[in-house]
Amino acid sequence: MESTTRTIAARKHIALVAHDHCKQSLLDWVETNKAPLSEHVLYATGTTGNLMQLKTDLPVNSMLSGPMGGDQQVGTLISEGKIDMMIFFWDPLNAVPHDPDVKALLRLVTVWNILVATDRSTADFLISSPLFHQEVAIVIPDYQRYLAERLPS
């Protein structure tokens, strides 16, 4: 597939997602990084987003709960170019009923070349990068060209 570039603005749109056993860890990370996160637009799956707002007072665009379609809502935003980065603290040792949605979400961040951290160490590296507060160009699939090649003229 051909590729093109997309510019990620200095003010990032960040998805925050956590499995049940990882929610407290993500909430602790958000609290620690409240100041830099406050400069960006935050999205989260339902339970995580609501807890985040209660504990940090940060504005969060909350989707549905992950198992109720929230993971898919975040995936849609990624596909539409509306998410620039995802912090997803997932539990690799416990299966969840919506594992196919989780796998699809991780596939989409890879397809669309979205920055993703699945643990605190990686999230710390992302948020401490000088690029976190800068405009950045990323390479993404050229979906318009992809469609043009497959549709009759």
UniProtKB/Swiss-Prot annotation:
MF terms from GO for this chain are: methylglyoxal synthase activity
Q: What is its EC number?
A: 4.2.3.3
Among PROSITE patterns, the record links this protein to: METHYLGLYOXAL_SYNTH, MGS
Q: Quote the Gene3D superfamilies the UniProt record gives.
A: Methylglyoxal synthase-like domain
Q: Name one GO cellular component term.
A: cytosol
Question: Which example biological process does GO assign this protein?
Answer: methylglyoxal biosynthetic process
User: What highest taxon heads this organism's lineage?
Assistant: Bacteria
Enzyme class, first EC level, given as a word: lyase
Q: Which SUPFAM superfamilies match?
A: Methylglyoxal synthase-like
Q: Which residues form the active site?
A: D71 (proton donor/acceptor)
Keywords on record: Lyase
**Function of this protein?**
Catalyzes the formation of methylglyoxal from dihydroxyacetone phosphate.
UniProt lists the family membership as follows: Belongs to the methylglyoxal synthase family.
> What is the protein named?
Methylglyoxal synthase
Organism annotation = Sodalis glossinidius (strain morsitans)
